[in-house]
Amino acid sequence: MGTWILFACLVGAAFAMPLPPHPGHPGYINFSYENSHSQAINVDRIALVLTPLKWYQSMIRPPYSSYGYEPMGGWLHHQIIPVVSQQHPLTHTLQSHHHIPVVPAQQPRVPQQAMMPVPGQQSMTPTQHHQPNLPLPAQQPFQPQPVQPLPHQPMQPQPPVQPMQPLLPQPPLPPMFPMRPLPPILPDLHLEAWPATDKTKRE
């Protein structure tokens, strides 16, 4: 009877408490500490003995292996990098679609963008001497292109500004709720009628 209880306790402890991996067998309980005779057991026999544990642990996946910090960190880093790269195209698409509020913002932004490479060019002057032809043609076509659409954009935003103005007259729709004065009138009538009905009912 006592041996069965001891065996049940050992089995329960084997399933309940995860032990750190031993050098002989990774991640599973090594019974060589229990008996002196089992110290001579080969790793293959231990694997055969521990196959139920392997099956049980494969059924119940440990949270540390499946929810490790490395995949989450890698996932976050992978998400951050595309977001940063997508912000620039998104700003350009927003600027192209919404000309009205962005046109005043574009004009100051373009000089700022032009000012940002200037310090970079001054600091990178030694590298530009090595490759003077490659960066200059790449930067010059990009700068005239935003400058040329800017004079055209003030011509285009004027029609979209007019659709924005009709949106402002649309808020007169909320004034269509002058029904609010009517509810106070009805409760006043009811308040006057309620005390009379209550008094008659009480009498």
Curated annotation (Swiss-Prot):
Keyword Repeat: yes
Molecular functions (GO terms): structural constituent of tooth enamel
Ranges of biased composition (kind: Pro residues): 143-180
Region (Disordered) location: 116-180
Localization per Swiss-Prot or TrEMBL: Secreted, Extracellular space, Extracellular matrix
Compositionally skewed regions (Low complexity) per UniProt: 131-142
Main location group: secreted
Xref: Pfam families: Amelogenin (PF02948)
Any one GO CC term of the record: collagen-containing extracellular matrix
Range of residues in the leader sequence: 1-16
Alphabetical UniProt keywords: Biomineralization, Extracellular matrix, Repeat, Secreted, Signal
Positions with biased composition (Polar residues): 120-130
GO biological process, one term: enamel mineralization
Role played: Plays a role in biomineralization. Seems to regulate the formation of crystallites during the secretory stage of tooth enamel development. Thought to play a major role in the structural organization and mineralization of developing enamel.
Family in the record: Belongs to the amelogenin family.
Protein name: Amelogenin, Y isoform
Gene name as annotated: AMELY
